């Protein structure tokens, strides 16, 4: 089993980074859609605010209006990705948390650092992933390759939620007992402009301090995946790949 996370920024250029000939019935694709969210928000005049968590990871503040844009944008990305795969003879099946694949609980508060102070945000529609519907995914795998949009569903509040695509990929990999987790991004991990081709797990912390933003988040998910049974994690960009094992 292999789980492939496709970053929203690379969906339009998948033919340059994804070897579709290697896809088989034991693969699951998860995708994000930040590029699509930003583009749709601009067209609709919806302000998207980006904040930084106390751990240093940037995130999008998800108001109810932003949530509506988020869901619509990710479903558009999902359609494009599924169409790309089907045009190449792959039986791709578009799904999301709204189909019951990814269940989450809405966060009661979100912490962010503003002007050097930690503040609490209580009107956010982001979630903590609670479970992956393994039975449903196994049924999808019988007929094709599931392509999961990173939208979760909160059954208690009956609302969709914004969840991080890298975290969705991690949870799917663990739930499905995947041997490999692959992140497709616009860039591999760089230090001083050079691609880091391999990160031994025993030296992980040394490399982590050079990472920032989305790459730091990917590396953190990579370590959790390896510690939870995944054998290999690959961060693959247009400029090369970083293997973590």
Curated annotation (Swiss-Prot):
Keywords, comma-separated and alphabetical: Amino-acid biosynthesis, Arginine biosynthesis, ATP-binding, Cytoplasm, Kinase, Lysine biosynthesis, Nucleotide-binding, Transferase
Catalysed reaction equations from the record: [amino-group carrier protein]-C-terminal-N-(1,4-dicarboxybutan-1-yl)-L-glutamine + ATP = [amino-group carrier protein]-C-terminal-N-(1-carboxy-5-phosphooxy-5-oxopentan-1-yl)-L-glutamine + ADP; [amino-group carrier protein]-C-terminal-gamma-(L-glutamyl)-L-glutamate + ATP = [amino-group carrier protein]-C-terminal-gamma-(5-phospho-L-glutamyl)-L-glutamate + ADP
Name of the top EC class for this enzyme: transferase
Keyword set includes Mitochondrion: no
Pathway in which this enzyme or protein is active: Amino-acid biosynthesis; L-lysine biosynthesis via AAA pathway; L-lysine from L-alpha-aminoadipate (Thermus route): step 2/5; Amino-acid biosynthesis; L-arginine biosynthesis
GO terms for cellular component: cytoplasm
UniProt function note: Involved in both the arginine and lysine biosynthetic pathways. Phosphorylates the LysW-bound precursors glutamate (for arginine biosynthesis), respectively alpha-aminoadipate (for lysine biosynthesis).
Protein name: Putative [LysW]-aminoadipate/[LysW]-glutamate kinase
Source organism phylogeny: Archaea, Methanobacteriati, Methanobacteriota, Thermococci, Thermococcales
């Amino acid at each position: 089993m292999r789980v492939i996370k496709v970053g929203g920024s690379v969906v339009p250029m998948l033919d340059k980074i994804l070897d579709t000939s290697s896809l088989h019935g034991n693969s699951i694709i998860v995708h994000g859609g930040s590029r699509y969210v930003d583009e749709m928000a601009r067209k609709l005049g919806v302000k998207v605010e980006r904040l930084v968590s106390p751990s240093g990871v940037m995130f999008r503040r998800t108001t109810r209006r932003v949530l509506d844009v988020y869901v619509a944008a990710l479903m558009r990305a999902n359609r494009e990705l599924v169409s790309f795969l089907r045009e190449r003879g792959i039986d791709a099946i578009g799904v999301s948390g709204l189909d019951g694949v990814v269940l989450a609980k809405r966060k009661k508060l979100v912490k962010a650092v503003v002007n050097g102070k930690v503040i609490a945000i209580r009107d956010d529609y982001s979630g903590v992933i609670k479970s992956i519907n393994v039975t449903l995914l196994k049924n999808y795998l019988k007929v094709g390759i599931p392509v999961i949009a990173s939208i979760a569903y909160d059954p208690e509040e009956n609302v969709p939620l914004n969840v991080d695509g890298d975290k969705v990929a991690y949870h799917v990999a663990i739930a499905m007992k995947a041997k490999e987790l692959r992140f497709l991004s616009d860039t591999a991990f760089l230090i001083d402009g050079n691609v880091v081709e391999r990160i031994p797990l025993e030296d992980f912390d040394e490399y982590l301090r050079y990472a920032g933003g989305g790459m730091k988040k990917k590396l953190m998910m990579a370590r959790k995946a390896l510690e939870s049974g995944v054998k290999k994690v690959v961060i693959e960009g247009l400029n090369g790949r970083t293997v973590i094992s």
